[in-house]
Structure formats: structure tokens, C-alpha cells
């Protein structure tokens, strides 16, 4: 047999699809919809169930009431079925057959309402053994019981007295059970006939109903325990699922159609509830009589109450019996039923069952776990109850959920979970979560103003570890803030501070000096302190830095002191490197060594001057007597003050015409340098570096200042420490660094670390180019043997092992790399980056800088990055290095369209040929300001042109001529300037602009087409399709001209 669909079976049986679906659910077969298919065995089981439920034929639910007759063969055979004689205790727990569902016990107690009349005797004689009436709150049995016992079901305990025979014609008021007359007016059930069933006090150890096991079916149509739910009455007398006479089907009408009185509770006049086919008595396992507890207020006979008779709940008195402890229990005094819910009337409710029973019955309280929806005027069913209250009888809506839930399944208790008291930790976490800030829907930890220390170039992961947050959350926050970064990418300090402010943290960026100190402390190294006591300290020469404005004679002064000519070797006559020299002079018939450091005076070398002031003991400020105080003079003065070093002023060029040393003294007084002759403490010396005048006086002033205000001592026996003044890449010697030893003694063979470079000292040269084996404090030397070119201004120190030197250098390199990446950063927000690049609004000039010394490269890079020609163009330094231009530089420039700048270096080997072949622009410079000027011009050339409006002339309309071909033509008189053809114009009327961006398409003078009309002449102007012109209007013409970018 092929599979059939549910709706096809419903059409075949003449019932609705939902009736068939409900029957299938009661049989334990679950389908999703009316279009679902079912197997052939299920079809046969469904057919048998519907035939048994409809008196042996598959008829529609709304069939006429069947006449009393014999029960179906299956039903008639069931009471006579043999049962095992020995009752077992487990029989009360195992389902033997699906004779009946869970029932609610009845308890003694009065039932409110009119007393029912005694019922007539049943048509068929009762067996000799005493029988008991079905509990009034028992729900309809599952349809699976109609088809006989389920295979494998255990037999129940035998009942004494045998089975009750099926009594044809046994009904209520002569009507067969299975047909309901009217929804609103139910028949009187007090006239049901049958022998009085004595009630027992103890619960019957009966079998658990067969059918779907409780808890195994989360989609059952009954309560949430998995039991079949008794169907509540439907409005308008709609048939119930299962057909006429099916369990839980329509109720028969009372005698005479009168209103129901309250149902009897355990009185002798109670009749057994029919089960199965029409008129059939409910069979019991083994024919045993069911013990029944006394009903409350057990008056014999009577009508069952209806909503009209009981408009409100009784104010006092004991409640009718609630549900039994799961399944069909004895009638009790309102004791709560088990999770399975007490049986009962519509909605699974008992008669006013207490919590734990089904949903509300007659004015019932709320159903407990697994209970159904409210019934007649019932309160809401418990959570998870199926169906809810039915309309039409005042039933309140049932609990949440339409289909059954899983409460009570697998031994779990039903109903809402009880919420225990929260611990202090839970309450604290909830409180903190309430206060946690949210940025773009991302929850973040909230600080209370505590400080978070991060190094330069820190990533979001580093920040997240400090505050105990998730790095992915911080990435989401940055996306919401318009920054596209990853969790491990270095982020700028400003971005991290903004993020910290959002979460109420105070971010502290660790300075480079602090970072380096912490790094050295991790290796148990102290930098900047003299080891040993006072007995180990010896005098050292002073370190003097010569500072001042460009071209004021600093290098000439040093040449005079050293009796050399360094100026001749400097490109452009300006110093572009830091030079360190040591000279010996006689002061008061005593030889004294003085170390001089020459710093550049050009504005691009600010970092070099700061570095020179930081490593010096005394500063000589050179000021030209003819120029006076200049910008770089003030800057050098500020550097010296910041370094807290004493200053000796050398007023140079006193032999030049126009020199005025007094004027220089007066100008420097404004900056806090008061000469000794004016009552101050600053020594001023008038010199001429070119003529060699007063040089000895200057050296004497330096020595006196050092002796008077400085304690120049150091320990020469400790490991050397100092500063790298300059570094460069030599073709024959590799990386070379000029270092100034400040403490200790540097020897050949020592392992040293200079910034991110390290290595063993292979050789040392002094300022005269001679090899030396060791260098003491305040001695400048040239060091060979480093792995790479260190940065100018980096500290150096000697360590014991090569491994320690390598680890320190690698960590410094990683730190500097992160800092550079963060400094470069993301210059555009996430929202406008793509649009700006597509529209060409942002352009970048990529540069590769190579130089002869690290200080020069640093100065050039900083100067180029300070160029500001607008927001449309930006400079990006792809690479910088010391040494000649190599092939790798050309390859990098080829892939990135970069310009290579060689500062005092040339392309090496085949690099020049490759650059010419690839079309890479390589520019060579020897003077720094020339490079800056050319790059600035290139940046301005990349700018998009700016246009400005230039007015050409105005014309007044004297007459308007109409032309069928051209429209309106204005006869004008040019008042000022000139009017040209194909230029833009605007129309002005009474001082207000009427139209913009008009085009002068036609221009005539008399009958001739002309290109322009000058001031004072008349002509005709055609404005194209624009015809709204009047006399006395003014036509102003203009054009857009490119504006030079400055």
C-alpha cells in the first residue's frame, strides 16, 4: 500500500484533517501537517481506532446519535480477557493496556450547587462483585485503548468481581454517550443509570495507561507530561477529535434536556462512565472493582453544574477533589496531583484542582506542571500546558505554548524553574555588567579612573590584557569608531587614548627612556650610574657643544681651535653631521683636554642639536656680531637650557663691518643670559674665528666654567657606557659609529650594544684617524664591527655575552618597529578611505631615503614629514637607510612608484642601470634644503588645481527681441569689462540673482557673429534655452581660472 497523506484520509473518513491529526497524536504517531504522509500500518491502526470510536464505521464526527447497541467486538472482548491471577506491585506502575488515562481522586467534601437527584438503575444488571463509579474528573481515555491492548504491555493486577459488562443503551438520560447536543446547554448527567459503586479509601493499584509514555513525546496534544490531553469542549458544538463515542468525546445530554445539577461525588446513585463504543461500560483489568474514596458531599444523583449555574467560585468550604498523584488516582480531598496532572474535565482540569492537578476545572485554580489549559471558567493552566482554555465557557487562556512542552519529561519537574537566591558574586557581576559601557553594541569593561601603562606602538591585544577585555571586542569598537585595525596591529597613541577614555581608563604611554630602562632592568643592567664609591672616580675632560645659527661660524671656530679646515669639506659650506673632536690646550700653564661636539645650525637638524645638548657638559653659543640673535640661536639656547648645561657665549665676527657686540648682549638679556659686566653670571667672549682673535680667552672661559660649576668625574674601571653621536655605512669598513664614552673604558674586543645594533669592537679610531686600543671617559672614537648602522643619539653599553647583546638589540628593534608603524598609522577613517581613493581626493608621494649618515637621514625625514601643502597630498616614507642606493631599493621603488632620494650617496653597481631601465626617478642631493625645496614643489604639483571665479564684464538689457528660432534675444549695452562668447553668466534682477551658470551661446553685433563685445558697445546676447529675461536685467559674465597653489 502506498503512502497516503493525512488530508486524503480525512476526506475518506469524512472528517476534518485536524481530527485525524489529533487521533494520530493520541495513537503515538506524530505528523507535522495535513500534507504529511503516513505508513500503511499506521493507516490501519487509525482506521480501526476511528471505526471503534464511531460504532464500527468510519463516519463523520457530526453523525446522528447512534442507537444503543452492542459494543464493538474489541470492546466486548476486552472485559472477558483473562488476566494473570496474581497481582504484582509493579502492576500499578506498568501500563497493561490503554483502558483509561490518569484520573483525579475524589475526596469527601460538599460540592456547591443543587443536590443531584438519584440516578435510575442501569439497563444491564451489574455484576455481583461491587463496582465503583468512574471518578468525575477522569479524562477521556486515549484512542489507543480502543484498538485493544498494546503489544508488549504488562498485564495489570486482576480486579475482584470481574469486568463490568458492556451495557447497551447505558447512557445519560437515555442518550448514547458520544453525541453532544449543545455547547452552551449541556444535558443533565445526573440521570445516568448504573449500579452504585462503593468508593474505596485507598488508591487502586491499577495499571498505568498505555499509549504514549509520559515524557517521551514533547509534541503531544495533551499536557506537557506527554499524556494524552482531554479535549475541551469546542464552541458551537464542534465535534471532538476521535469520533463519536471515542474517549473524551461528546458528552450525552441529560434527561429531558434540563440543565445540569452538580455532579454527584461518590454517592450510591453514580453510574459508571461508558468507555469505547456507544453505551459500552468502561472495562477494568481483570474485572476488578475499582476502589473509590468517599466523594465530598456525596449526595446521590444530581445534575452536573454548568457555568450558568456557578457564576463564581464558592467563598468557603472544602474544595472538590483534585488530581491524583499522577495518572488516575483515587478521589481525594483536594490533594495535589503529580506532575502528570489530575484527570478531569475539559482542559485536563479537575474539579477545582489545586496546583499540581490539571488546568482549572469548574472555577479551578491554576493548573500545575504539565496541566492543560483552563476549562469552564478555569484559571490559566500551568506553563507549557497545551491548548489553553477554550472560548465559549468563560475559560481563561491557557499557559504559554500551544503544543505540549517537555516539562515533566525524563523525570524532570514541570512548571517554571524556581529561581534561587543569587550569590554575591552573581549580583556583583550583574551590577558591573549594568555599568559596562557599550560602544556600537559591544560591551566593554568599565574602569574607575585607574591608570594603564602601555609602551609606544602597543596593539589592541596589549591593551586588552591590561584591562581584562576581549581583543575581538576592542576590534569591534574600533570598527564602530571608524578605525580599521587588527588585534595585533600597532595602534597610535591618540587612538588608544580615545579608546581608554570611552571605558574610563587613564592611559599612560611609556616614554622611550623609560622603556629602555625597563628593558635593561630585565637583564639586570643599570645604565647611567657610576659604579663603585668616591675612591674610584677620577677627573675627566669637559664635553663642550658648539651651537648657534647657520653660517655664524661654529665650524670655523672649531677649525681654528684644531688648526684644521673642516668647512672646506662640507657641502654648501654648512655642517650636516655631528663632528666630535678632542683638543689639548694650555690653561694657566696646565695642559687640559677638551672634547668638542660640532652641531649643525640648519633648521633641519633640530634633533642633532638636541642630541648634542643632551650629551654635553658646557654649551658654547656662537652668535654673529653683525646678524645678532636668529631663530636657530633661540632654538639652540632653549636646547641648552632644557639640558641644564651652563652656557658660554662667543660673539663671533667682530672684525666684520657692521658688527655690534653690545647689541648681541642686549638681545640675549631678553632670553635670560645676562653678561658678567651687566651683573649676570654668563661669560661673553668677543672672538673672530677667521682671524683667530681671543680664542685662548674662550678656552679659558670654558675651563673656568667647568671647574666652577661642574663636578666632572667618572669611573674608568667599569664597563663602558655612552652615546652614539653619529653613524654611517662605510663601503670598506661596514657600519661605523662615532661614540662618546661617558663612563668606563671601551676596549677593542668588547661586546657592545648600540641601539638596535650590536657586535664586537673590531677597531677604534680617534678624531685624527689613528687606531687606539682603548677610550676612556669623555673620549670620542670611531667604532667598527657593528651588525648594522645604529641610530644617532642611541645609547651604547658593553655587556658580558654576545647572546645578551643580541636579545637587547632585537627587543629594541621590535619596539622601534612598532612605534614607527603606529606613528605612520592609518591616516584615513574607515568611512571615507575607499571613497577618497576612488575619487582621487587623496594622493601619496612615496619616498625612499638613503644617506651617508643616520643623523642626516633622520633630519631629512623629519623635515619632509613636516611639509604641509594640504590634506589632499601626503608623504609616505617607505624605507630609509644609510649607504648607497642598491638594487633592492630600486625594486621597492618599482613596485610602489616611489622616488629614491640619495643624500650624499650614489647608486651602486648595477642599481643605476636598473633604475634607468625601470624608469625609477632617483634624485641626488648634497645640501639638505635643496632636497626639501624640490620635494615640496613636487607635492604642490600633485595637488589638484584650484579654480577661482573671475568676473569678465556686465551688460545691461535695453531691449528684448523674440525669435521663433532662437527664443528671446537680449539687446544689451556692455557696462564694464567685456562679454565673451561661450562663457558663464548669471542673470541679476533688482539686485537678486535670478539664474546661475547660464551659457552665452550666441553673441552678435548688428548682423555679424562676434566673439566678444567690449565696454561701451551694444550687441545681442542669446542665453540658450533660458528665456526669462526682462528689460533692465543685468547679465554678469565670468570664467573659472586656475589658482596657483602656495
From Swiss-Prot:
Region (G4): 652-655
Compositionally biased spans, kind Pro residues: 107-128
Binding site for GTP: 548-555, 598-602, 652-655
Region (G3): 598-601
GO cellular component, one term: cytosol
Listed Basic and acidic residues bias regions: 177-194
Region described as G2: spans on this chain: 573-577
Top-level lineage group: Bacteria
Residue ranges with Gly residues bias: 239-248, 266-280, 319-414
Region ranges (G1): 548-555
Amino acid composition bias (Basic residues), ranges on this chain: 418-427
Chain residue ranges for the region called Disordered: 49-450
Region: G5, residue numbers: 688-690
Annotated tr-type G domain residues: 539-711
Keyword tags: Cytoplasm, GTP-binding, Initiation factor, Nucleotide-binding, Protein biosynthesis
Main subcellular location: cytoplasm
Residue ranges that the Swiss-Prot or TrEMBL entry lists as coiled coil: none
GO molecular function: GTP binding; GTPase activity; translation initiation factor activity
Function noted in UniProt: One of the essential components for the initiation of protein synthesis. Protects formylmethionyl-tRNA from spontaneous hydrolysis and promotes its binding to the 30S ribosomal subunits. Also involved in the hydrolysis of GTP during the formation of the 70S ribosomal complex.
Family: Belongs to the TRAFAC class translation factor GTPase superfamily. Classic translation factor GTPase family. IF-2 subfamily.
HAMAP family: IF_2_B
Database matches in PANTHER family: TR-TYPE G DOMAIN-CONTAINING PROTEIN, TRANSLATION INITIATION FACTOR IF-2-RELATED
Name recorded for this polypeptide: Translation initiation factor IF-2
Organism: Streptomyces avermitilis (strain ATCC 31267 / DSM 46492 / JCM 5070 / NBRC 14893 / NCIMB 12804 / NRRL 8165 / MA-4680)
Name of the gene this protein is made from: infB
Amino acid at each position: 500500500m502506498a503512502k497516503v497523506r493525512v488530508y486524503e484520509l480525512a476526506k475518506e473518513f469524512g472528517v476534518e484533517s485536524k481530527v485525524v491529526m489529533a487521533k494520530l497524536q493520541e495513537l503515538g504517531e506524530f505528523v507535522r501537517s495535513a500534507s504529511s504522509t503516513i505508513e500503511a500500518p499506521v493507516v490501519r491502526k487509525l482506521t480501526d481506532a476511528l471505526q471503534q470510536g464511531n460504532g464500527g464505521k468510519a463516519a463523520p464526527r457530526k453523525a446522528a446519535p447512534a442507537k444503543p447497541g452492542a459494543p464493538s467486538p474489541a470492546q466486548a472482548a476486552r472485559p472477558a480477557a483473562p488476566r494473570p491471577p496474581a497481582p504484582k506491585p509493579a502492576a500499578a506502575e506498568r501500563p497493561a493496556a490503554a483502558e483509561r488515562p490518569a484520573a483525579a481522586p475524589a475526596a469527601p467534601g460538599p460540592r456547591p450547587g443543587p443536590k443531584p437527584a438519584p440516578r435510575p438503575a442501569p439497563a444491564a444488571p451489574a455484576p455481583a462483585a461491587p463496582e465503583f463509579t468512574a471518578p468525575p474528573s477522569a479524562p477521556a481515555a486515549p484512542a489507543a485503548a480502543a484498538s485493544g491492548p498494546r503489544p508488549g504491555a504488562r498485564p495489570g493486577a486482576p480486579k475482584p468481581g470481574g469486568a463490568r459488562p458492556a451495557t447497551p443503551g447505558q447512557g445519560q438520560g437515555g442518550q448514547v454517550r458520544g453525541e453532544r447536543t449543545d455547547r452552551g446547554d449541556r444535558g443533565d448527567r445526573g440521570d445516568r443509570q448504573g449500579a452504585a459503586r462503593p468508593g474505596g479509601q485507598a488508591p487502586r493499584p491499577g495499571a498505568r495507561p498505555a499509549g504514549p509514555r509520559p515524557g517521551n513525546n514533547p509534541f503531544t496534544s495533551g499536557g506537557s507530561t506527554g499524556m494524552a490531553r482531554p479535549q475541551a469542549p469546542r464552541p458551537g458544538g464542534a465535534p471532538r477529535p476521535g469520533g463519536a463515542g471515542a474517549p473524551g468525546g461528546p458528552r450525552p445530554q441529560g434527561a429531558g434536556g434540563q440543565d445540569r445539577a452538580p455532579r454527584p461525588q461518590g454517592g450510591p446513585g453514580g453510574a459508571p462512565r461508558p468507555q469505547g463504543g456507544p453505551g459500552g461500560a468502561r472495562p477494568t483489568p481483570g474485572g476488578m472493582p475499582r476502589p473509590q474514596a468517599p466523594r465530598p458531599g456525596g449526595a446521590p444523583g444530581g445534575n452536573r453544574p454548568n457555568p450558568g449555574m456557578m457564576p463564581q467560585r464558592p467563598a468557603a468550604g472544602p474544595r472538590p477533589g483534585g488530581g491524583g498523584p499522577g495518572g488516575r488516582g483515587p478521589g481525594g480531598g483536594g490533594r495535589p496531583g503529580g506532575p502528570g496532572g489530575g484527570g478531569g474535565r475539559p482542559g485536563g482540569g479537575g474539579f477545582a484542582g489545586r496546583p499540581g492537578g490539571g488546568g482549572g476545572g469548574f472555577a479551578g485554580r491554576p493548573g500545575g506542571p504539565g496541566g492543560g489549559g483552563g476549562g469552564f471558567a478555569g484559571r490559566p493552566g500551568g506553563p507549557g500546558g497545551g491548548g489553553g482554555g477554550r472560548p465559549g465557557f468563560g475559560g481563561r487562556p491557557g499557559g504559554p505554548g500551544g503544543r505540549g512542552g517537555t516539562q515533566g519529561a525524563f523525570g524532570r519537574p514541570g512548571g517554571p524553574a524556581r529561581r534561587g537566591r543569587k550569590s554575591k558574586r552573581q549580583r556583583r557581576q550583574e551590577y558591573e555588567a549594568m555599568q559596562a559601557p557599550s560602544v556600537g553594541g559591544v560591551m566593554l569593561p568599565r574602569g574607575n579612573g585607574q591608570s594603564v601603562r602601555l609602551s609606544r606602538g602597543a596593539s589592541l591585544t596589549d591593551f586588552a590584557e591590561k584591562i581584562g577585555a576581549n581583543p575581538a571586542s576592542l576590534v569591534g569598537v574600533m570598527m564602530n569608531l571608524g578605525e580599521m585595525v587588527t588585534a595585533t596591529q600597532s595602534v597610535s597613541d591618540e587612538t588608544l587614548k580615545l579608546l581608554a577614555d570611552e571605558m574610563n581608563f587613564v592611559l599612560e604611554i611609556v616614554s622611550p627612556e623609560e622603556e629602555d630602562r625597563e628593558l635593561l632592568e630585565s637583564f639586570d643592567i643599570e645604565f647611567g650610574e657610576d659604579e663603585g664609591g668616591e675612591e674610584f672616580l677620577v677627573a675627566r675632560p669637559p664635553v663642550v657643544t658648539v651651537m648657534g645659527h647657520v653660517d655664524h661660524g661654529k665650524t670655523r671656530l672649531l677649525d681654528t681651535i684644531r688648526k684644521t679646515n673642516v668647512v672646506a669639506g662640507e657641502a654648501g659650506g654648512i655642517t650636516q653631521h655631528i663632528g666630535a673632536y678632542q683638543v689639548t690646550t694650555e690653561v694657566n700653564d696646565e695642559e687640559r683636554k677638551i672634547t668638542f661636539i660640532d652641531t649643525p645650525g640648519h633648521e633641519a637638524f633640530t634633533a642633532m642639536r638636541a642630541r648634542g645638548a643632551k650629551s654635553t657638559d658646557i654649551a658654547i653659543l656662537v652668535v654673529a656680531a653683525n646678524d645678532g640673535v636668529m631663530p636657530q640661536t633661540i632654538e639652540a639656547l632653549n636646547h641648552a637650557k632644557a639640558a641644564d648645561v651652563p652656557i658660554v657665549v662667543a660673539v663671533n665676527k667682530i672684525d666684520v663691518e657692521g658688527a655690534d657686540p653690545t647689541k648681541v648682549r642686549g638681545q640675549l638679556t631678553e632670553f635670560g643670559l645676562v653678561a658678567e659686566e651687566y651683573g649676570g653670571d654668563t661669560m661673553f667672549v668677543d672672538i673672530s674665528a677667521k682671524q683667530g682673535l681671543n680664542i685662548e680667552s674662550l678656552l679659558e672661559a670654558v675651563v673656568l666654567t667647568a671647574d666652577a660649576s661642574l663636578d666632572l668625574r667618572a669611573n674608568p674601571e667599569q664597563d663602558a657606557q655612552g652615546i652614539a653621536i653619529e653613524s654611517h655605512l662605510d663601503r670598506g669598513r661596514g657600519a661605523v659609529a662615532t661614540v662618546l664614552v661617558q663612563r668606563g673604558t671601551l676596549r677593542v674586543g668588547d661586546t657592545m650594544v648600540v641601539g638596535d645594533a650590536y657586535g664586537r669592537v673590531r677597531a677604534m679610531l680617534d678624531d685624527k684617524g689613528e687606531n687606539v686600543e682603548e677610550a676612556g671617559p669623555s673620549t670620542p672614537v670611531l667604532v667598527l664591527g657593528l651588525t648594522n648602522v645604529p641610530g644617532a643619539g642611541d645609547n651604547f653599553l658593553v655587556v658580558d655575552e654576545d647572546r645578551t647583546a643580541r636579545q637587547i638589540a632585537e627587543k629594541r628593534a621590535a619596539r622601534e618597529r612598532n612605534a614607527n608603524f603606529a606613528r605612520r598609522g592609518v591616516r584615513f577613517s574607515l568611512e571615507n578611505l575607499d571613497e577618497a581613493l576612488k575619487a582621487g581626493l587623496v594622493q601619496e608621494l612615496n619616498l625612499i631615503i638613503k644617506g651617508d649618515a643616520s643623523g642626516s637621514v633622520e633630519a631629512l625625514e623629519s623635515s619632509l614629514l613636516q611639509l604641509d601643502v594640504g590634506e589632499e597630498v601626503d608623504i609616505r616614507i617607505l624605507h630609509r637607510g644609510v649607504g648607497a642606493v642598491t638594487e633592492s631599493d630600486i625594486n621597492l621603488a618599482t613596485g610602489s612608484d616611489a622616488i629614491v632620494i640619495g643624500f650624499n650617496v650614489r647608486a651602486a653597481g648595477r642599481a643605476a642601470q636598473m633604475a634607468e631601465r625601470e624608469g625609477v626617478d632617483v634624485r641626488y642631493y648634497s645640501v639638505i634644503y635643496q632636497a626639501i625645496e624640490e620635494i615640496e614643489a613636487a607635492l604642490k604639483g600633485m595637488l589638484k588645481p584650484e579654480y577661482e571665479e573671475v568676473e569678465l564684464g556686465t551688460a545691461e538689457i535695453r531691449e528684448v527681441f523674440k525669435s521663433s528660432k532662437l527664443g528671446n534675444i537680449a539687446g544689451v549695452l556692455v557696462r564694464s569689462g567685456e562679454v565673451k562668447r561661450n562663457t558663464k553668466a548669471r542673470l541679476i534682477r533688482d539686485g537678486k540673482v535670478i539664474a546661475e551658470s547660464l551659457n552665452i551661446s550666441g553673441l552678435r553685433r548688428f548682423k555679424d557673429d562676434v566673439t566678444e563685445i567690449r565696454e561701451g558697445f551694444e550687441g545681442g546676447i542669446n542665453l540658450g534655452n533660458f528665456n526669462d529675461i526682462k528689460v533692465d536685467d543685468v547679465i554678469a559674465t565670468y570664467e573659472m581660472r586656475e589658482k596657483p597653489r602656495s
